[in-house]
UniProtKB/Swiss-Prot annotation:
It comes from Mus musculus (Mouse). Its main location: nucleus. Gene3D superfamilies: 2.60.40.2690. This is Splicing factor 3A subunit 2. It is found in: Nucleus. InterPro entries: Matrin/U1-C_Znf_C2H2, Matrin/U1-like-C_Znf_C2H2, SF3A2, SF3A2_dom, Znf_C2H2_sf, Znf_C2H2_type. SMART domains: CactinC_cactus, ZnF_U1. The keyword Metal-binding applies. Residues 1-27, 208-475 are annotated as: Disordered.
Amino acid sequence: MDFQHRPGGKTGSGGVASSSESNRDRRERLRQLALETIDINKDPYFMKNHLGSYECKLCLTLHNNEGSYLAHTQGKKHQTNLARRAAKEAKEAPAQPAPEQVKVEVKKFVKIGRPGYKVTKQRDTEMGQQSLLFQIDYPEIAEGIMPRHRFMSAYEQRIEPPDRRWQYLLMAAEPYETIAFKVPSREIDKAEGKFFFLQFHFKMEKPPAPPSLPAGPPGVKRPPPPLMNGLPPRPPLPDALPPPPPGGLPLPPMPPTGPAPSGPPGPPQMPPPAPGVHPPAPVVHPPTSGVHPPAPGVHPPAPVVHPPTSGVHPPAPGVHPPTPGVHPPAPGVHPPAPGVHPPAPGVHPPTPGVHPPAPGVHPPAPGVHPPAPGVHPPPSAGVHPQAPGVHPPAPAVHPQAPGVHPPAPGIHPQAPGVHPQPPPGVHPAAPGVHPQPPGVHPSNPGVHPAPMPPMLRPPLPSDGPGNMPPPPPGN
C-alpha cells in the first residue's frame, strides 16, 4: 500500500489521525485541565476499587481511568444526582434557627473637643529609669465612664507614614476626642509599681463633734450622747477600783467606807486572807505555877506577838458567829503556812469594849522562859505550838480558880476552841487555817454559843498570874 501518495496527505508528515486517536487525545487534555482545578482526592464520591478501576459512589458508575471519572463529574447525570442529594438532605435536616449575630451597639455621643493634657519627663533617682507622666484633664467625662488607654504601633495608624522608631499612646474617654502621644518605640516596663497610680483618701477616724447643747434648767435631763457605731457609751468606771489580782484570783472584799475607830496605832496591817480561810484563833491556856517539860514533838512558839491591826475592835457584846455558809476546817488540818506567826503564849482575848493592849503587856507564867528573840522554829505538821513547860490542856477544859466571878450579864463568852470573829467589815490579821475542835460549828446560822459555866470561864488579865490556882491533877 502506498502511504506516501494518498490523497490529503502531505509529503514528510505522518498519516491522518483516526477518530479514536483524536478522542483519546481530547480526554487526556480534559483530564489535565480538571486536575489543575479539582483535587480528585478530596471528592467524597470518588473511590478506587480492588481491580484498579474507579467508581462513583453517587452515581454507581465504573471508570477505567481518572480522566473518565473527571468527565463523568462534569456530565449531566452526576450533576443531577448532586442536586437531588442536596434537596434530600435539606428536607431531612431539622429546622435549626440561624445563630443570632451579636450586634455591637455603636456608642453615639457628641464630641466636645480634645481634653487638656500635661506631659512631664521623669527619672528615677535610685534606678535611673526614664519615665513619662501624663496628666489628662477630663472635667466633663460621661457618668460611669473610665478613661482607657492603649499602645499602638506605627504600622497600625493611618495618620502619619509608618516609622518603626516611634509608637503611639492613645487615651480615650467619652465625650472627649481620642488623643495620641508619639513616644519612642521602646519597651514599656509594666511591672507593679512602675505603671499605674492610685490616689485614695483615709476615712475620718473621729466623727465631727456634735454641737454643744446649752445647759438647761436644773432638774432637766440632757439627751444621751450619740451612739458610736450603733453601740451605747460605756458607763464610767469607779475611781477607787483596785486592780485585778494576778493569776485569775477573785477580788478581795472592799474595805469599809465608814470612819475608822480611834485607837492606839499598831504595826502595819497584814494582807487579807484568801477566801474561805478563817483567821487565827487566840488559844487560851491558863498559866501554871510550875515549870513542866514540854511534850515530846512540841516546838516552842516564836516570841514575836502580832497584836490586832490598828483600828480593829474585839467583838462587841452580842456578836454572833460568822455568816452562814462558812464552815470551820475539819480536825487534823495542818497549822498555818511558814511565815505566819502563832499567837504568843499567855495572850488572852481582851474583854468586850476594851482595846487590845500593846504587845508584851501580859506577864508570862512564873517559871516560863521565852525563847531567844528572832528564833522561829518551824511548826510540825498537825501539832500546835505550845509554850515551853506548859502542858497542852485537855480539849475544851480550862480550870478556874474558886471564887472567880462569872462574866457580866449580856456578854456571851466564847466556847473553848471557838475562834472569835471580828465585827463585819474588818479583815482578820494574817492568813492561815487553824484546826477547830470536833463538834463545834460556829458557822451554823442563828445558833449562839452556850455560856460557859462559872468554873470554866477563861482567866482575865486583871487576875494576875499569882491568883491562878494550880491545874488539877491529870487523870
